[in-house]
């Protein structure tokens, strides 16, 4: 087929991607051809399973492969064969890109308990409308670009908000971005190179996993626990092959909803210092946490921590305004990278967010939102427990519950069946650094009040029980 060269400067992941894409492009591998399984290819070529997983996932994302549950990987029909593809032919392709595409399509599935945002009537809509009216009534230039680091008054306000969390910094240490995903992308492109070992929560944010794979990173999952982390595993992974960065979400972790204890956070900082690792802290749900909870940034004071957060979850995801804070030299580098990639961020959006934040009703809205989420957690968690689901933890805050049922072995199969009922679920394999099959599911509690979702789950559990009894 093709030969891998371990001494090459090109990563093994990229060699596999290049090898297969060439075979498909030249017609050696034709549409519909079945490919070696991940384990078969890894064994035949003497590489790790994770290397092949990364390569296959990139080939799926680039349109060369399609993954079919329980069947394996196949060469996807190319564009010239599109007229031969039956309607709905991609329904089996529930990979990272399918999830990212369908979850944001307004014309897609109408019930989305697997999504990652709040319903419109839970957001600060009135505050946004007041900010828009204020902005429209004043004088604002629509020529030129905004500040490279973002709208200065908003950066100053972020500085003050972080000071309330015991993080001491200057305005120059803050960079505004187009949401937290943009911030994660910038820091990843600054710190991660193809072939690098990168530590990441397991499970983790699906979009981050996908983005790091595209950079050619070797993802090393640090198992999350209800208390925080598998600390023994973390230290083991830090010893070999010596990763230099750890992307983590200590508070209201996505997808599990768990928050790390103070003892676990101190230990993570100790290990980062011992092994010279940069910690990228994703804290986008901090405004949803009703309990006083320190951040890694507050414990470290941005010496080794890069802090990322966003206003998308509580004000409006459509505005796409986030930020990062860190060591002055690193923030200057990231500001330069931001300019190279897309010039400045959207100052109009930043001004709207600023107007919403200085609105006297903002803090009351945030408090009401936290109370509403707590009430929803109690109700939805009880519902899942009544149905026989296991909860990873009961966070009683934030947006997510991470659940599994003893009758459901592979959540991906359930998610595929859910699409036939106009329901989009969040199956666990999408949040796995290695894309391993998983029985776990992420549920957004704010979208779980639709009885159709629970009716479907109950039917599937009963169906699985009948199949088990028949076997």
Predicted feature residues:
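N-terminal basic, amphipathic alpha-helical segments
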Residues: 1-133, 335, 339-345, 375, ...
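Structural signature of PLP-dependent enzymes
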Residues: 334-341, 357-381
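Conserved PLP cofactor-binding pocket of PLP-dependent enzymes
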Residues: 420-442
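Conserved glycine-rich beta-strand-loop-beta hairpin in the small C-terminal domain of fold type I
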Residues: 371-381, 391-404
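Active-site PLP attachment segment
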Residues: 70, 300-333, 348
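Conserved core of the PLP fold type I
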Residues: 141-275, 287-300, 462, 466-470
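Short beta-strand "wing" residues that participate in macromolecule-binding interfaces
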Residues: 66-68, 169, 425-426
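Glycine-centered flexible beta-alpha turn that most often forms the glycine-rich phosphate-binding loop
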Residues: 282
């Amino acid at each position: 087929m093709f030969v891998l060269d371990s001494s090459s400067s090109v990563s093994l992941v990229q060699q596999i991607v290049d090898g297969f894409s060439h075979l498909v492009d030249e017609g050696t591998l034709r549409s519909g051809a079945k490919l070696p399984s991940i384990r078969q290819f890894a064994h035949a070529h003497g590489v790790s399973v994770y290397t092949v997983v990364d390569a296959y996932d990139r080939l799926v994302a680039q349109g060369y492969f399609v993954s079919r549950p329980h069947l394996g990987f196949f060469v996807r029909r190319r564009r010239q064969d599109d007229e031969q593809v039956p309607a709905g032919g991609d329904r089996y392709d529930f990979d990272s890109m399918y999830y990212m595409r369908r979850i944001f399509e307004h014309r897609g599935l109408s019930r989305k308990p697997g999504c990652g945002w709040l319903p419109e009537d839970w957001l600060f809509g009135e505050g946004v409308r007041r900010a828009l009216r204020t902005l429209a009534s004043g004088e604002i230039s629509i020529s030129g670009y905004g500040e490279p680091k973002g709208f200065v008054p908003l950066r100053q306000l972020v500085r003050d908000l972080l000071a309330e969390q015991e993080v001491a910094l200057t305005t120059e240490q803050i960079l505004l971005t187009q949401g937290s995903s943009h911030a994660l992308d910038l820091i990843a492109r600054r710190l991660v190179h193809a072939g690098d070992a990168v530590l990441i929560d397991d499970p983790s944010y699906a979009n981050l996993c996908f983005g790091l794979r595209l950079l050619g990173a070797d993802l090393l999952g640090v198992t999350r626990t209800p208390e925080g982390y598998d600390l023994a595993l973390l230290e083991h992974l830090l010893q070999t092959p010596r990763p230099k960065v750890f992307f983590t979400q200590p508070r209201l972790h996505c997808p599990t909803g768990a928050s790390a204890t103070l003892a676990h956070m101190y230990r993570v900082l100790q290990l980062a210092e011992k092994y010279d690792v940069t910690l990228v802290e994703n804290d986008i749900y901090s405004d949803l946490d009703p309990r006083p909870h320190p951040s890694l940034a507050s414990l470290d004071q941005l010496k080794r921590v890069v802090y990322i957060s966003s206003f998308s979850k509580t004000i409006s995801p459509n505005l796409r305004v986030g930020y990062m804070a860190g060591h002055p030299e690193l923030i200057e580098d990231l500001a330069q990278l931001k300019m190279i990639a897309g010039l400045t961020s959207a100052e109009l959006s930043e001004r709207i967010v600023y107007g919403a934040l200085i609105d006297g009703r903002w803090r009351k809205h945030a408090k009401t939102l936290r109370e509403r989420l707590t009430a929803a957690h109690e109700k939805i968690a009880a519902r899942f427990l009544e149905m026989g689901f296991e909860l990873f933890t009961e966070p009683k805050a934030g947006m997510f519950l991470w659940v599994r049922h003893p009758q459901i072995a592979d959540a991906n199969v359930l998610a595929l069946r859910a699409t036939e009922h106009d329901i989009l679920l969040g199956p666990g394999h999408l949040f796995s650094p290695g894309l391993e099959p998983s029985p776990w599911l992420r549920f957004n509690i704010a979208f779980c009040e639709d009885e159709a979702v629970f009716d479907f789950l109950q039917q599937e559990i009963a169906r699985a029980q009948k199949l088990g009894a028949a076997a």
